[in-house]
Amino acid sequence: MSAWLSRFARDGFDGVELWEFHFLPAEKAEQERLVTAASSVAIYNSYVGFADEEAEARAAAAEAITRLQPRGVKYNLGGDASKRDEYRRNLLAWADALPADCRLLCECHGGTILEQAEDAAAFFADLDPARFGVVVHVSGDAAGTEKWFSELNGRVQHLHVQMRGPESDPSVAANRPALDAGFAVVKAHGYTGSVAIEFSRGIGRDEDIEEIYTNACTDLAYVRQV
């Protein structure tokens, strides 16, 4: 992973959202290279769980985050509604174990207890929005984007941009109206937070990394334009 950082910078990316499994299982030398280049690691993308029995994984992630000092950490809660209070208690304890200036960014992914915007708004209502933010996925679904911004506007701090299929290629004029509509919602809400190109066209079993990267650069240019 570290070998890509200079190329990312050269091609106009401000930093990287570092996938947890590109760091924790990496050899010590690679971890040290990433720590040395930590200013390039804007977001740490974690897959820890928040059930009581997952405390060891949370501790390992907290140690990695302390070493890397990212501006934020992306996470998700679990999908068991009966464990809502347990997840919340462990989330708050985990926040205390992280650097004080590290923002906690909930992806509110499908299949989790916070996949609905109104549920996420209620869960975070009494927590500091500067510390406890959310991630919104932006593509061609303007109505979905509007719902998240309307419910959690002051808490939206990070965007995941997914342009996976050919219908999401911003270089094709016919695709632009739907894509532009989604980003118009973002602009209308005065968003000034960070953006990650999460997935681009070409991912799959027979994927070509150079093709995917070229597409990601196309997506980057589009996001900067709109």
Region locations from a protein language model:
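Acidic-and-aromatic substrate-binding clefts and catalytic sites of carbohydrate-active enzymes
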Residues: 15-30, 48-57, 79-86, 111-116, ...
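Hydrophobic faces of well-ordered beta-strands that scaffold small-molecule active sites
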Residues: 16-18, 39-46, 71-75, 104-106, ...
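Structural motif
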Residues: 10-11, 67-68, 154, 189
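C-terminal alpha-helical cap/extension of soluble enzyme domains
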Residues: 192-213
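N-terminal pre-domain/capping segments
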Residues: 1-66, 129, 166, 213, ...
